Swiss-Prot record:
UniProt-listed GO biological process terms: mismatch repair
Region (Disordered): 114-137, 369-401, 438-457
Name recorded for this polypeptide: DNA mismatch repair protein MutL
Primary gene name: mutL
HAMAP family: DNA_mis_repair
Record Gene3D superfamilies: 3.30.230.10, Histidine kinase-like ATPase, C-terminal domain, MutL, C-terminal domain, dimerisation subdomain, MutL, C-terminal domain, regulatory subdomain
Record-level GO cellular component terms: mismatch repair complex
CDD domains, A to Z: HATPase_MutL-MLH-PMS-like, MutL_Trans_MutL
Family annotation (SUPFAM superfamilies): ATPase domain of HSP90 chaperone/DNA topoisomerase II/histidine kinase (SSF55874), DNA mismatch repair protein MutL (SSF118116), Ribosomal protein S5 domain 2-like (SSF54211)
Lineage: Bacteria, Pseudomonadati, Pseudomonadota, Betaproteobacteria, Neisseriales
Entry GO MF terms: ATP binding; ATP hydrolysis activity; ATP-dependent DNA damage sensor activity; mismatched DNA binding
Biased composition (Basic and acidic residues): 114-130
Listed InterPro entries: DNA_mismatch_repair_CS (IPR014762), DNA_mismatch_repair_MutL (IPR020667), DNA_mismatch_S5_2-like (IPR013507), HATPase_C_sf (IPR036890), MutL/Mlh/PMS (IPR002099), MutL/Mlh/Pms-like (IPR038973), MutL_C (IPR014790), MutL_C_dimsub (IPR042120)
Length: 658
């Protein structure tokens, strides 16, 4: 067996380079982060051959002292930490002192730097790990680092590099992440001598638009929330902007781009109820917290981290995003502060609050939304205070949109209300509903003739609710509604599906425990030994989820009670899934996940179907419910429930004004 011997420093550096510098983008990241730590306000990046032939980074930072310039290229030489306590509280991008030494060992590196109080710059070169003597050079205040011929002395490593275009794409992505994390710094990027972009110092809002795109900015919701020493802010895309790729997902912790499972899981959970199929959300999230609350010294590239309290981080991310997405309904804006506080609404009227979890009011029994009398304490459709939205059927617009008399539409109203009566178990007094909502509307009287132009009878912007008023039904599928300077198309089945789904979920949350119903005849099934053991160990857990099972002996189990909401589910399959998971992990989310699936299915089958003819009062009642329902912009499967065509877009279809 060979004797043990210490490795030469140059080989050690090359081994370290294999961890830190996998490709040109990693070398670029290490150099640019040094510029950021130096307090630079402008960073210029030049790439040649995708960063393989040349990486040049120039900054206007504080520079390096002439006596330290050689030391800067040695391993574990840094000005950022001195003690273990410094490491635990590190706030700088770099701190190990490995980056430049690793790059110098696998490239031809030139370092030129000048401090403000120096009369000239100092330059040092490194090739194959060997340093030249420092020399005087001409250079403005700041630092320029050139790394040429990356991996020239490790041909095996160079063979693993991709094409120049691919390596450039990785470098450009890296610069975009760094620019996004530090909007106060101006960045420029050149590729093979051609300017790719030049970003001035900007606000975060402007930088997001410049990097992620104006389309994301238009379709995003701003968030800003805090919990103790933690602050989460940034922008998340509406569910309708979701893509099949993850290229527009950015997580920053203390302005460092990371790939963290805790944050990504929280984001996924928040979007779970509004995304369609395999689509992924787009987001730019910034989490600021004390440096000692996160360990960044986990991976050489520092993209993996560990939180001291991952549960707190998960809850902050989940609840902030969940609240923001829940407030994406027609009467709310896209700006959310402090985990969902609404700043203002699109009409200038105070928006309606989210329905209370204790609110057992029938979804159609909303006489207070559009009062027929002058009740000072009656809530209007936009909120509990502010301007009062007038009763739509008392305006001059009402006779023009009435297609059926109240007497003719009674049968349809009974049918539609019955759908909600089944989910609410609340007796809908239709006569009171009609009197409250349509008491002043003429029943059989034809629309009065008037010399006033049609446009004069349309309510002003302050009178129109966010989704406007229904004017017709199209092909038995869509509701056409007129809002301020726009035409809305609403998928009535998808909209009713979301309204029902959210109401049933709210009922579930109010109880805290799934209500169960006993089966008239218990259902038995043959169980495995593991399933029988799980029942013996977790009988109370099952009871809390509304499942009551008993062991009949001989590996036979009997289901005696199931959750009320899941009465029509496959009882045996549900019991097996829960028992199987309990046997493996000792806890279960199967019931909750299954319940959400069943709730979605129930709301789908319990909602108004395509082809069903609705009256205008029914259509308008659905629109008002959408305005007061969280996540009403999407159905339970993530599909949009409504779209808008502006007057400008309609004019363009007919070439008006061209």
């Amino acid at each position: 067996m060979p004797r043990i011997a210490a490795l030469p420093d140059h080989l050690v550096n090359q081994i370290a380079a294999g961890e830190v510098v996998e490709r040109p983008a990693n070398a670029l990241k290490e150099i640019v982060e040094n510029s950021i730590d130096a307090g630079a306000t402008a960073i210029d990046v030049e790439l040649d051959g995708g960063g393989i032939r040349l990486i040049r980074v120039s900054d206007n930072g504080s520079g390096i002292h002439p006596d330290d310039i050689e030391l800067a290229l040695h391993r574990h030489a840094t000005s950022k930490i001195k003690t273990l306590n410094d490491l635990e509280h590190v706030a700088s991008m770099g701190f190990r002192g490995e980056g430049l030494a690793s790059i110098a060992s696998v490239s031809r590196l030139t370092l030129t730097s000048r401090q403000e109080d120096s009369s000239h710059a100092t330059q040092v070169k490194a090739e194959d790990g060997k340093l030249s003597s420092p020399t005087a050079a001409a250079h403005p205040v700041g630092t320029t680092i050139e790394a040429a011929e990356l991996f020239f002395n490790t041909p095996a490593r160079r063979k693993f590099l991709k094409s120049e275009n691919t390596e450039y794409a990785h470098c450009a992505t890296m610069i975009e992440r760094l620019a996004l994390a530090h909007p106060h710094i101006a960045f420029s990027l050149k590729r093979d001598g051609k300017q790719v972009f030049k970003l001035p110092a900007q606000s975060l809002h402007e930088r997001i638009a410049a990097i992620v795109g104006d389309d994301f900015q238009t379709a995003s919701l701003e968030i800003d929330s805090g919990s103790g020493a933690l602050r989460l802010y940034g922008a998340i895309a509406k569910p309708t902007f979701a893509k099949g790729k993850t290229d527009k997902q950015y997580c920053f912790v203390n302005h460092r781009f990371v790939r963290d499972k805790v944050m990504l899981h929280a984001v996924k959970q928040a979007y779970r109820d509004v995304l369609h199929n395999a689509l992924t959300p787009a987001f730019v999230l910034f989490l600021d917290l004390p440096p000692e609350a996160v360990d960044v010294n986990v991976h050489p590239t520092k993209t993996e981290i560990r939180f001291r309290d991952s549960r707190q981080v998960h809850q902050l991310v989940f609840h902030t995003l969940n609240k923001a997405l829940a407030d994406t309904r027609a009467d709310l804006t896209e700006s959310v502060s402090n985990a969902g506080e609404v700043l203002h609404d699109i009409t200038g009227v105070t928006p309606a609050p989210m329905p209370s979890e204790n609110d057992s009011e029938n979804l159609f029994n909303r006489a207070s939304d559009y009062p027929t009398g002058n009740k000072p304490d009656t809530r209007n459709a936009f909120g509990s205070s502010g301007k009062t939205a007038p009763m739509p059927y008392q305006s001059a617009y009402a006779p023009q949109q009435r297609s059926l008399s109240l007497r003719e539409s009674r049968a349809a109203m009974n049918t539609y209300a019955e759908l909600y009566k089944k989910t609410d178990d609340i007796d809908l007094e239709l006569s009171q509903f009609e009197q409250a909502r349509f008491g002043n509307m003429p029943s059989e009287t034809p629309a009065p003739k008037t010399d006033t132009p049609l446009s004069d009878g349309i309510p002003s912007q302050s009178e129109l609710p966010p989704l406007g008023f229904a004017i017709a039904q199209l092909l038995g599928i869509y509701i056409l509604a007129q809002a301020e300077d726009s035409l809305l198309l609403i998928d009535m089945h998808a909209a009713a599906e979301r309204v029902n789904y959210e109401k049933m979920k709210r009922q579930r949350q109010e109880n805290g425990r799934l209500q169960s119903q006993r089966l008239l005849i218990p259902i038995t099934f043959a169980a495995s030994h593991e399933e029988c053991a799980a029942l013996a160990d977790y009988a109370e857990t099952l009871a809390g989820f509304g499942l009551e099972l008993s062991d009949m002996g001989g590996n036979t189990l009997a289901v005696r009670a199931v959750p009320t909401m899941l009465g029509k589910a496959d009882v045996v399959s549900l019991a097996r899934d829960v028992l199987g998971e309990l046997a493996q992990v000792g806890s279960s989310q199967t019931i909750e996940e299954h319940e959400n699936h069943i709730l979605a299915t129930m709301s789908c089958h319990g909602s108004v179907r395509a082809g069903r003819q609705l009256t205008l009062p029914e259509m308008n009642a659905l629109l008002r419910d959408m305005e007061n329902t969280p996540r009403s912009n999407q159905c339970n499967h993530g599909r949009p429930t409504w779209v808008k065509l502006t007057l400008k877009e309609l004019d363009a279809l007919f070439l008006r004004g061209q």
